[in-house]
Amino acid sequence: MEEIQRYLQPDRSQQHNFLYPLIFQEYIYALAHDHGLNRNRSILLENPSYNNKFSLLIVKRLITRMYQQNHFLISTNDSNKNSFLGCNKSLYSQMISEGFAFIVEIPFSLRLISSLSSFEGKKIFKSHNLRSIHSTFPFLEDNFSHLNYVLDILIPYPVHLEILVQTLRYWVKDASSLHLLRFFLHEYWNLNSLITSKKPGYSFSKKNQRFFFFLYNSYVYECESTFVFLRNQSSHLRSTSFGALLERIYFYGKIERLVEVFAKDFQVTLWLFKDPFMHYVRYQGKSILASKGTFLLMNKWKFYLVNFWQCHFYLCFPTGRIHINQLSNHSRDFMGYLSSVRLNPSMLRSQMLENSFLINNAIKKFDTLVPIIPLIGSLAKANFCTVLGHPISKPVWSDLSDSDIIDRFGRICRNLFHYYSGSSKKKTLYRIKYILRLSCARTLARKHKSTVRTFLKRSGSELLEEFLTSEEQVLSLTFPRASSSLWGVYRSRIWYLDIFCIHDLANYQ
């Protein structure tokens, strides 16, 4: 039991009283602002407006106000007035939330460094760019030959603000920072402004995404740490963490090791977790749990998770938020893809003496397809085509130079191919490329007051080369006449680690 208690109390940050003074440093807000600019890149928008009002002068004014300690005292007689933020309440609150989120991530970064240093003699790649979206890649590439059912889970919300603060108490041993967090949440925010429940999953306030993502990830980590603990104590393939919570979840690598289930008090529950063929992944506000068990076993999982969230987090969690689906008959919108299980048939010939046998074996594998209708809808919303997919010109870009117009269209096309490089079939992407190329040609023809045919004859191959993807460019230079290599690119699935920056596709509903 002592080992269980040690596991349930993970290796928290041991730093004390060093975070709060950073809230008064100007460079913290500058770093947080630059980080936000780098994270808010867009595919279809060339100049996303992150925060045009940021300036060091406003930061100095904010820090001056924070130095006046009496403004942090909550007065019961004057609760409706807010002399601390003044007339710039929205801007100041956004800056405080960004700066605070940047500061409280420091203990997690320190824990990441310590976890990486524990691997002696192993070369670990720099994982500061890892996000939970990257954990979906091995999930989509896994072999699901023995899996039958899948649990589609909507992670419960809303969580009480005080529970979020108490969760951070185990990570951030800085009472002043926690008091500031509690004051900030209860004085300037309510839960409805941070989360909206109009759509399935989570919809975060656009002005304070990083701040609430951090709180939300802390809460989800508490859920998943207990879940992983129960899984580890019963599985013959024990999971060992090799990265720290950066922005979403843990990443786990499996090693073969027989473990003894010593937790006698958990024997009634642990028998549910003895299935070694189990796959779990989380993306945004959803979780997916696949298992080879029967429908009865998955139903027990469902009620266990409901009771866990209700008892541990005091949440009213209806059972309708967890759906049990048969893996072979269910498709889902997942990470911007339309995912379903595809059966890959394979024929084996076996010969014993004079007799030969043909063995037909079907392997289950996730098939990731490009959702053509939502993608054309996004292009139509950005005025690249009609809702039916017919290319149109973009008049707002007609004042730009020819090279800028071609560069913008080409960059959008390459970004789309870059994000959907994990697709099993890329035929849809070439249709999108056709729409963008013709839209670019129509825009240029409109600018020069000529027809599309005339402009294409004059431009030659220059317009075609601008829309080549990075893989096609490499193959065209290496194997200029090898069409089979291009066919291999068409069929292969490639996952890039930087696709989490592309918010238009990763977060579309």
Swiss-Prot record:
GO terms for biological process: mRNA processing; RNA splicing; tRNA processing. InterPro entries: Domain_X (IPR024937), Maturase_MatK (IPR002866), Maturase_MatK_N (IPR024942). Keywords: Chloroplast, mRNA processing, Plastid, RNA-binding, tRNA processing. The keyword tRNA processing applies. GO terms for cellular component: chloroplast. The keyword tRNA processing applies. It is found in: Plastid, Chloroplast. Its main location: plastid. GO terms for molecular function: RNA binding. It comes from the Eukaryota. Usually encoded in the trnK tRNA gene intron. Probably assists in splicing its own and other chloroplast group II introns. Belongs to the intron maturase 2 family. MatK subfamily. This is Maturase K. It comes from Nicotiana glutinosa (Tobacco).
